[in-house]
Amino acid sequence: MDKEKYSFMNPKGIETFAFIFSGNALQWLHGTTTDDNGRKIGNFTLFGDLLARMALADGTAKGFHRPLTLSVGQAQYSEEQLSTQWSMGRKRIRRLLDELARLELIDTSRSRVASVMTFPCLLQWMTKDGSVVSNPFIHKQRERIEPL
């Protein structure tokens, strides 16, 4: 897949989000990453693309070789797929995901069967129909913070 043909995804079906970011995470989100072709991509665009993969309801993820049951707030991903879509090498994708985990923007769980990420910085979201969903994957130290 040519990145020029890939349209970065935006979360669908969500009216608003409530996040909590560290200062370092905010700095990263406002920065850019250069792909293998020398094009700059806003880091918030990359984060939004990952967030758009998040399950909004419990169910089976489609589009991968092996179906995987996901809970609300989880996203299945493939480093190989991200590498192709974002025009970056797989090692670079791995380092980028590791950096996002260090900044507590995502948590990842990798296995031979599937790779799953969660978004511990996401407190809750409101769907288009007005229902509020609390993120079940908030880090423990964040649970004491009251969302707006």
Model-derived segments and their meaning:
Residues 23-27, 34, 83, 92, ...:
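A generic structural signal for solvent-exposed, polar alpha-helical segments
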Residues 54-118:
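Winged helix-turn-helix DNA-binding recognition segment
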Residues 1-79:
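Short recognition helix of helix-turn-helix/winged-helix DNA-binding domains
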Residues 1-11, 89-148:
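Winged-helix/helix-turn-helix nucleic-acid-interaction surface
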